[in-house]
């Protein structure tokens, strides 16, 4: 009997342990399903947010394609969840079968439980990976489809008003940013919806159009070359797109309309115009300065050229002067045949060397008189008043020019043989130089210039 009771107790303990294992397996399956559903919800939210952000910048047709992709991803993900649940249900059946076995097989049950946990985790990872891959593939397909549907950007000139376009409405109209105004613009000509612009600023376009200033502007613009009357203002009515309805005005009129609507914009326009005129004035001043600089450069070039010419002329003049000096020197030494005697003896020159013989022994003992025949007597009388005891030691009765002859005598004798006065034609003999030598040298100089008969 005691043995039976022990067996019954052991069977009860095995039954309790088996039931505990069963509850553990069920709780584990529930936690796996919860974690898997959470991961799927997160992936669906991420894909939904991405698709929504793209749909905001695209047309309604593109949003439809993205909504289809979202529905596809939502419809696919539950299927994965169902397949995971089916696999988990299979594992729970196996766990229930293991609970009916004997307690001596508990070690096998524990190893099987661990493998079941690992297989469940692998299934979760696979299902999550497959759903993420599907979502990423679908999102990539959406992006490629959207990029193919984008309207190509058009290039305009730098001064074209259509550069303010930021997004297209369709092939004919687009949205743009005109200063602080959000505007609708025609793509073919750049006209801007004046009705919407005035309405956004709290004004009505027809009030501006009725003003005298508006009529003057429109008439002036119509009269401008290259602009037709029907090309200044255009009205769009009807159609499904209410956004594009209204009156569109030429860009030159839009600036005036915006200034009429908004005082702030009018002041901004004033600042721009002031800056433009200031720059224009500066450019004009710079042009004038440039013209003056160009004139100064031209004049300076002419001056430089004239300086070069003057330098050449000076060089040529110096050369001519050298030739003249050389010619004069040759004339002074010309031979007797080239200097004929004068036909008028009274104007012929004489050179007279006088010895002063003064009692007081003044500074200079000799004098040179350069006279013509007609003035010889008067010159000698003046000399004798100053030097009463003076006497003639040499007379050159004829010379073409007594001044030139005496100048040559001074050039040849004053350094080593005579000492000259700075104010007159008086002189002294240097040491070791006698009157005889003086007379001889003067005659030699005279004869070298002109060979006169004695």
UniProtKB/Swiss-Prot annotation:
Pfam families: DUF3627 (PF12299), KilA-N (PF04383). Signal peptide: none annotated. Residues 14-64 have a biased composition (Basic and acidic residues). Residues 98-123, 130-158 have a biased composition (Acidic residues). Residues 1-159 are annotated as: Disordered. InterPro entries: DUF3627, KilA/APSES_HTH, KilA_N. Residues 172-276 form the KilA-N domain. Residues 1-12, 65-79 have a biased composition (Basic residues). This is Putative KilA-N domain-containing protein L4. It comes from Acanthamoeba polyphaga mimivirus (APMV). The lineage of its organism: Viruses, Varidnaviria, Bamfordvirae, Nucleocytoviricota, Megaviricetes.
